[in-house]
Amino acid sequence: MSESVHTNTSLWSKGMKAVIVAQFLSAFGDNALLFATLALLKAQFYPEWSQPILQMVFVGAYILFAPFVGQVADSFAKGRVMMFANGLKLLGAASICFGINPFLGYTLVGVGAAAYSPAKYGILGELTTGSKLVKANGLMEASTIAAILLGSVAGGVLADWHVLVALAACALAYGGAVVANIYIPKLAAARPGQSWNLINMTRSFLNACTSLWRNGETRFSLVGTSLFWGAGVTLRFLLVLWVPVALGITDNSTPTYLNAMVAIGIVVGAGAAAKLVTLETVSRCMPAGILIGVVVLIFSLQHELLPAYALLMLIGVMGGFFVVPLNALLQERGKKSVGAGNAIAVQNLGENSAMLLMLGIYSLAVMVGIPVVPIGIGFGALFALAITALWIWQRRH
């Protein structure tokens, strides 16, 4: 069955506003919960190497449910899928508040996030299309990064005051996201009537993976976004250990302020990409990707707070300019070939596999005692080389 299209071309329709508000609150909860739960692990004397494990169980849920969540997003009204997913996040955050093992609660939040992602991005192609899709992605990324900015800081600051208050604030944010989802128009399902046989769904997902991988443009987008988000998540945990070593600061809030600088930069970079890059000129984003790695390397050598703030903001600007066009390219090409929900689910598999791999390597490096500054230097250099190799490959093909 061909994919249905339900498009309102206005960037500020009622449906788009509801999506942006819901995304802000959901992402706010995600980021506040990460730092609140990290503070809980510190308070309960978990070892340092267990910190990235928290994120690994989260992304593990993405990988486990990757064959199914794309079809869920395309088989039901995406706004209702988003509401159900935020309900799962609310349940996970509440369970941590009530003393359930934080790794189990965070895994449940990961399941909700896995179901949420294909729907939140797939709905953009139903609310707008064509040249405005890049701008819609810019709005989505700006909302997400604003939530990262405020959520990360709120999680750290509230955790310094009282960990339980920080966790409760996360649950309230997810509750607000559920309410906002109610106001998203109930559009017809994009691809209703598909088989729910798990074996067939897995086979269909693998076919979608193969289809997107065989297309040069979507393969390029998948590799680029996977490298970016894998590196971005690893950088967040690197900062948690880097701050006390390089700056001599041991509170919960300083790493969140530094993460906020990255978030501010991504908002700026996403806005610039929406104005300067189109689907036909996506390769313009590649130099920014290389510079991310170079600046991370320079950042790792800093010992003063102000240069650290400036360099992290620059990393964010480069990151926003790099990833927004790649997201839009995958959505536009993927919607036509395998469906928007399936395309985003495949993207999630790639991104979260990269996160799992990079976090695993980082956790292992910390466990064996490699100092955090050399880890940062090697991390930045390898990322710059990887994006350079991707650009060379893209130009040759």
Curated annotation (Swiss-Prot):
One Pfam family, short name: MFS_1
Membrane topology according to the record: Multi-pass membrane protein
UniProt GO cellular component terms: plasma membrane
Transmembrane segments annotated in the record for this chain: 18-38, 53-73, 91-111, 145-165, 167-187, 227-247, 257-277, 281-301, 305-325, 344-364, 367-387
MF-aspect GO terms: lysophospholipid:sodium symporter activity
Sequence ranges on the Periplasmic membrane side: 1-17, 74-90, 166, 248-256, 302-304, 365-366
Subcellular location: Cell inner membrane
Highest taxon of the lineage: Bacteria
UniProt-listed CDD domains: MFS_MefA_like (cd06173)
Keyword line: Cell inner membrane, Cell membrane, Lipid transport, Membrane, Transmembrane, Transmembrane helix, Transport
Cytoplasmic topological domain residue ranges: 39-52, 112-144, 188-226, 278-280, 326-343, 388-397
Keyword flag Manganese: no
Keyword Iron-sulfur on entry: no
Principal localisation: membrane
NCBIfam families: PRK11195.1
Similarity section: Belongs to the major facilitator superfamily. LplT (TC 2.A.1.42) family.
Protein purpose: Catalyzes the facilitated diffusion of 2-acyl-glycero-3-phosphoethanolamine (2-acyl-GPE) into the cell.
Name assigned to this protein: Lysophospholipid transporter LplT
Native source organism of the sequence: Shigella boydii serotype 4 (strain Sb227)
Lineage: Bacteria, Pseudomonadati, Pseudomonadota, Gammaproteobacteria, Enterobacterales
